[in-house]
Amino acid sequence: LQIMFSSTNKPNAKSLSIKLQLPLAIFQRKEVDILETISRAFHNEKSIREYSIGKYRIDLYFPKYKLAVECDENNHQNYEILNERLRELYIQEQLKCTFLRFNPDDPEFNIGEPISKIFSHIVNYHSQL
């Protein structure tokens, strides 16, 4: 249980581990670190981590800009491609949103790229007002 609570990114895991009096070691995942960096870069903008839509969750969602951000660690190798595409289409249909995906495990990954794309999306939104 300790490993499960320590490695999850579910918001209630920490409080539950405290109630169960389990020592909690923090093992941050790459996804968590990167999404926190992105959230800090846009701290003046409302963003929601693990945003739920139907049976799905979005890693990071900017509701004002209808922008879904997905961190695809290892290109989501454990996910079936068709199911992942259907998930994305469902979310886009429900939220009328744009998807931004990036893979932090790509050797060419640079945190500046998703931050720049989010910034461009926000600027584009404001220019159309």
Give residue spans per PLM region:
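Nucleic-acid endo/exonuclease domains
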Residues: 1-129
